[in-house]
Amino acid sequence: MKGDITLYMANDLGRNGYYDQKPIAELMGEMGELLGPECVLAVGDIHHFNGVASVNDPLWMTNFEQVYSHPELMLDWFPVLGNHEYRGNTQAVLDYGKVSRRWMMPARYYTKVFNKKGTTLRVVFLDTTPLIDRYQQNSDVYPDACKQDMKAELDWLDNTLKNAKEDWVIVVGHHPIYAYTDKAESERTDMQTRVLPILKRYKNVAIYACGHIHNFQHIKMKGDDIDYVVNTSASLARPVQAVKGTVFCSSDDGFSVISASKKHLNMYMIDKEGKVIHEIQKSK
């Protein structure tokens, strides 16, 4: 599983350590001793259910600091906002980097290039909640969503991908483009209308990975080189079933490992027992 560049991906975390959150956090730490990940991609909903009120909110301790306390998890964490963060103070999530040295969130959407042993990997982090109408139009529940400039983010995404020359490009955001779910279909159609054409435009995106649905899904659409991945919850999973394009799905909770070398990109879905239950392989 270890590559030139190795990353963790975890999302839909915040259960105050309950359910499987703490055991999975311990597993991530133990596996980290062998894999030596560069960082954790924290793809939204770090805090259920109403986000955080401030950088001093006790949820930072009960959902994050005291749970992900293994020495091997004292890494850079690169987060994105999920819909549950948008129920609270989203600026506090960005500002938490002034409190915790491992919280690396320079903006609501941003990009990071990893360069190691001659391999380059670009991760593009999206803020997907403001790209979806049902959040934009519900300011009572998601007060910060309507304040964001959708066009500016989409233009930034287009420009970022247009200029991306790395060996591999992965785009992550909280919401899926394709997935089995009983959540509103409009979430996916908005993502398909607004984000998908940009992802496909420059033919350099290998994987779009998300959370939100609380199960593992790997979807591949005919005529599309991008692999669409739903990463499960790292605390509490939900049932799943196959849909059009499903390569694999599982209702296990857990996390994922991304491994990159010059010619190969792999993503491993890990259950709470530490078993690899599915592997996505990309080659050049």
Where are the predicted features?
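N-terminal active-site segment of His-dependent metallophosphoesterases
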Residues: 1-58, 180
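Active-site-proximal loop/turn and secondary-structure-junction residues that shape catalytic pockets
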Residues: 177
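Residue-level signal for glycine
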Residues: 274-276
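Residue-level marker for buried hydrophobic side chains located in beta-strands
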Residues: 7-9, 40-42, 79, 171, ...
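Extended active-site neighborhood of metal-dependent phosphoesterases/phosphodiesterases
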Residues: 4, 48-169, 184-207, 213-261, ...
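Active-site flanking residues adjacent to catalytic metal/cofactor-binding acidic residues
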Residues: 11-12, 44-45, 126, 173, ...
